[in-house]
A protein has these predicted regions:
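N-terminal beta1-alpha1-beta2 submodule of the flavodoxin-like/Rossmannoid cofactor-binding fold
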Residues: 1-101, 164-191
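Amphipathic alpha-helical interaction elements
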Residues: 17-20, 107, 123
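Short, well-ordered alpha-helices that flank and scaffold nucleotide-derived cofactor binding pockets
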Residues: 30, 34, 38, 104, ...
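Mobile beta-alpha loop/short-helix "lid" or hinge segments that flank ligand
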Residues: 43-54, 141-161
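Rossmann-fold NAD(P) dinucleotide-binding segment
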Residues: 96-112
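Short, glycine-/small-residue-rich phosphate/pyrophosphate-handling segment
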Residues: 114-155, 168-172
Length: 191
């Protein structure tokens, strides 16, 4: 049951943008979803469980004509969201190929929807370069990225068998992203 008392809650999909079996995205996304539940109707989405193949649709995504059941299911899931929080690892300075592939499968479903970024890395950047690289991609499919973002440097020391241990200040960073997502999701999109 969603603890959000709002009769029309914002439907936030928290997407783990990694398919690695040992990815830190899962425990980090679980933590982020827990932080968001007070204000949003949260749906966790794990790209590894979605298991999209490399883009195999014969038509361009902008047509909305989908030949494959996996694309239609992905379309319905993305379309059901009002906003997104992408939990984004950084690999070699960029974001993951499976995540780009998942974006490329669709077009209309992303239009006008706000997107927040929670990036992470093993190093000191917290994945911020991957987030900067992702922003123009999100804008190209008509999404509205938040100005605020949250970043987690040194992720390997923060994930244990018990889950993710948030460093000091991260909850406040994420709260700023969630505040902006809520404001953007409640703002009508102009044509």
């Amino acid at each position: 049951m969603n603890p959000n008392p709002n009769p029309n809650p914002i439907r936030l999909h928290v997407i783990s943008a990694s398919v690695r079996p040992t990815s830190a995205a899962r425990p980090l996304a679980h933590w982020a979803a827990a932080q968001a539940r007070a204000r949003f109707e949260v749906t966790p989405v794990d790209l590894a469980e979605i298991a999209l193949p490399f883009l195999d649709e014969p038509e361009y995504a902008s047509t909305g004509i989908y030949a494959h059941a996996h694309t239609r299911a992905w379309s319905a899931l993305v379309d059901s969201a009002d906003a997104f929080l992408f939990v984004l690892p950084m690999y070699n300075g960029g974001f993951t190929a499976p995540f780009k592939n998942a974006i490329d499968f669709l077009y209309r479903e992303w239009q006008g929807k706000p997107a927040g970024l929670l990036s992470y890395s093993a190093g000191g950047s917290g994945g911020a370069p991957a987030g900067r690289m992702l922003r123009p991609v999100l804008e190209s499919v008509g999404m509205v990225p938040t100005e605020a973002s949250a970043a987690v440097p040194g992720i390997t020391g923060l994930v244990t068998a018990d889950g993710f241990r948030a460093p000091e200040g991260l909850a406040a960073e994420l709260a700023a992203v969630l505040d902006e997502l809520a404001a953007l999701a409640r703002t009508p999109v102009s044509a």
